[in-house]
């Protein structure tokens, strides 16, 4: 069963997909959004869900280091609810603390990617880390 992983920001949503067995995650794309204008990229997300035949969605939950939740965590929860309502898919959350830092470090240290190119792919890679961490901890989404 394929799952999507989402890294929800205020301007972009990074998207990753699992393999059919639910073992590995791979980055797909970055969807541009505009929270102020209530444009959440759901049409494009729906196309990806259909194309990849996703059966569930894992949304990164940006917790603070003390495990509390701030405004971005609330925005991620609201986005997950919109996805669940619009596409009738189960959603779950994965702590995304340090995934962007991890993605940035990988791009700099291992791939030697320029700053400009990093900005173009960082959210997609963060979504990949979110989904992979979820798969490693929980296996396929079954709720």
Swiss-Prot record:
| Documented EC number(s) | 3.1.-.-
Give GO BP annotations, semicolon-separated. Answer: rRNA 5'-end processing
Q: Name one GO molecular function term.
A: nuclease activity
Output the InterPro entries linked to this UniProt entry: RNaseH-like_sf (IPR012337), YqgF (IPR005227), YqgF/RNaseH-like_dom (IPR006641), YqgF/RNaseH-like_dom_sf (IPR037027)
Q: Which family does it belong to?
A: Belongs to the YqgF nuclease family.
List the GO terms this entry assigns under cellular component, sorted alphabetically.
cytosol
Give TM segment ranges.
none
Question: What is the top EC class of this enzyme, as a single word?
Answer: hydrolase
Which HAMAP family does the protein's record reference? Nuclease_YqgF
Cystine connections: none
The uppermost taxa in this organism's lineage are: Bacteria, Bacillati, Bacillota, Bacilli, Lactobacillales
Species, as recorded: Leuconostoc citreum (strain KM20)
Q: What is this protein called?
A: Putative pre-16S rRNA nuclease
Please explain the role this protein plays, according to its UniProt record: Could be a nuclease involved in processing of the 5'-end of pre-16S rRNA.
């Amino acid at each position: 069963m394929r799952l999507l992983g989402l890294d929800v920001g205020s301007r972009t949503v990074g998207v990753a997909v699992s393999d059919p067995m639910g073992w590995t995650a791979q980055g797909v794309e970055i969807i541009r959004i505009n929270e102020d204008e209530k444009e959440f990229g759901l049409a494009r997300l729906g196309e990806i869900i259909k194309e990849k035949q996703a059966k569930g969605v894992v949304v990164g939950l940006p917790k603070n280091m003390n495990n509390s939740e701030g405004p971005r965590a609330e925005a991620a929860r609201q986005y997950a609810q919109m996805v669940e309502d619009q596409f009738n898919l189960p959603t779950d959350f994965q702590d995304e603390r340090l995934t962007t830092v991890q993605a940035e470090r990988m791009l700099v240290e291992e791939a030697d990617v320029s700053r400009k190119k990093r900005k173009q792919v960082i959210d997609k890679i963060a979504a990949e880390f979110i989904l992979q961490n979820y798969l490693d901890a929980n296996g396929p989404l079954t709720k």
